[in-house]
Amino acid sequence: MKIMIVWRTVPGKYRPALEAFLRAGGPVPPGAKTIGRWHVPGSIFGWHLVEGDLTAVAQHVGEWADLLECEVYPVIEDDEAATAAKKLFAK
């Protein structure tokens, strides 16, 4: 399963969040794999696309909870969305 984590730094925690990222790099726990991570330069926002099980994603989000506010969304690719849409119109 692919999961998009949308994050922003907690108010007042920008520097500690950046220091933690520079120190460790934000690795995900076993059971998850980073597909990509994007940052808005000079801002507090970013996205992290992860593939894996929800337990590992929950652990990862929890590891950053004191520094980042996260929204977690399951995401699918175009072919999967098209398959679902075709089933809707087949009714």
What function would you assign to each model-found segment?
Residues 1-91:
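Conserved, structured core segments of small domains
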